[in-house]
Regions:
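Alpha-helical structural signal in soluble globular domains
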Residues: 10, 30-37, 64, 68, ...
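An alpha-helix initiation/capping motif
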Residues: 21-28, 59, 99-102, 106
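Active-site-proximal alpha-helix that buttresses catalytic centers in soluble enzyme cores
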Residues: 1-44, 50
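Active-site-adjacent alpha-helix immediately C-terminal to a catalytic or transition-state-stabilizing loop
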Residues: 28, 39, 105-150
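Short, amphipathic alpha-helical "lid/cap" segments that border enzyme active or binding sites
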Residues: 4-8, 102-109
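Phosphate-handling substructures
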Residues: 34-103
Length: 150
């Protein structure tokens, strides 16, 4: 939590036009610590979830998340958002291939490139972010990234 408080102070002077958060519980908690006041333009986006590789990367269904995090809008999430929307036995881990992860990163880059907002914060995960910036960040470390706007 101390890391999130430090990051909150570092980011306090930035007027973000859009905030994006992964739907994994740990990220929603981190997001809430960094941005404690509700911000109008916040999107919970499954594209920025972690690489599905371990049990900690398995998500929860939107109706369950909504009860725990009522200030977020989960209406754009499908029931099995952490498994590329494919139904599964929730007690199993269907690992995501690196190829599938990279395809998801490309879809995110395409999505971000068509946004009108210029100042965007993305609260996501190490492996996902590393596939964009080509190195790993420490917990609660931030990096400024300039996407290839067309």
């Amino acid at each position: 939590k101390n890391e999130t408080i430090k990051l909150r102070k570092l980011l306090a002077g930035i007027d973000f036009e859009l905030l994006i958060c992964s739907p994994l519980t740990r990220t929603l908690q981190t997001f809430t610590n960094i941005f404690p006041k509700p911000i109008k333009n916040t999107k919970v986006l499954s594209l920025v979830r972690e690489h599905l590789d371990h049990s900690c990367d398995v998500g929860r269904q939107p109706n369950i998340l909504q009860k725990e995090f009522p200030h977020f809008d989960f209406s754009e999430l499908n029931k099995y958002w952490w498994n590329n929307d494919v139904p599964l036995d929730e007690n199993e881990i269907n690992q995501e291939s690196i190829h599938d992860l990279d395809q998801r990163v490309l879809r995110f880059k395409e999505w971000i490139n068509i946004r009108k907002e210029k100042t965007i914060a993305v609260v996501s995960h190490g492996t996902f972010i590393s596939r964009i910036i080509y190195f790993f960040l420490d917990n609660c470390e931030f990096e400024i990234w300039y996407p290839d706007k067309k």
